Amino acid sequence: MASRRSSMTLYSRDNCVHSHRVRLVMEEKGVANYEIAWLRDGEESEDLLDLNPYNSVPTLVERELVVYDPRIIVEYIDERYPHPPLMPVDPVLRAQYRLAIYRMECDLYPLFEDLESTPAVARKARNRMTELLTTLAADFSPRQYIGEEFSLLDCTLAPILWRLEHHEVTLPSKQGERLAKYAARLFARPAFERSLSPVEAEMRPAMAAN
């Protein structure tokens, strides 16, 4: 359980793609003096239920503020710690980024629960993930797709790409190569390595050890 002396506490599961995304944003922002209250899969927390009526993770607590939607959390962190900015200033670009993030949240993130389900459900989710990522990668140019600066869009996509090998999701060679090169640059960032839970690090132990 996190120390009460910390000004910020993040309730997080060690194999939750949403929690990973929030931890990555916090590490990219260099947030100091925050604690992680780890919950294992299936573990419930009375403290969390008192704070969050949905009893969901990630949940961020900063003094009297409790935030429990991952998108709201990362946008709050981006505004609370303005440097480096993780969203463009231009309102049109911001809208485009938000739409891209929304599509990942709606289309890709929910598939991870199915990937942990029965073999039949997991196979269907794997095929759907492959289909969606192949479409994304078909015209993929990282700097065209995500802009010139590292952003919340990268932070949303990185936890997805990290889990593909673990869940045996493969893409056609041409599209897979494009995403793999981009993913390697994401995974090489020091903040990404720091964002990994022990469970997540074991998904790709050789890469996490580098």
Q: In which residue ranges do the predicted regions lie?
A:
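Extended, non-catalytic scaffold segments that flank or surround catalytic motifs
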Residues: 81, 175-178, 201
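GST-like domain detector, emphasizing the conserved glutathione-binding G-site
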Residues: 1-137
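GST-like fold's C-terminal all-alpha helical module
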Residues: 92, 100, 104-188, 193-195
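A generic membrane alpha-helix/interface feature
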Residues: 48, 167, 172, 207-209
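Acidic/histidine-enriched, glycine/proline-rich intrinsically disordered or flexible terminal extensions
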Residues: 199-210
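Short, solvent-exposed turn/loop segments enriched in Gly/Ser/Thr/Pro and often Arg
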Residues: 13, 152, 199
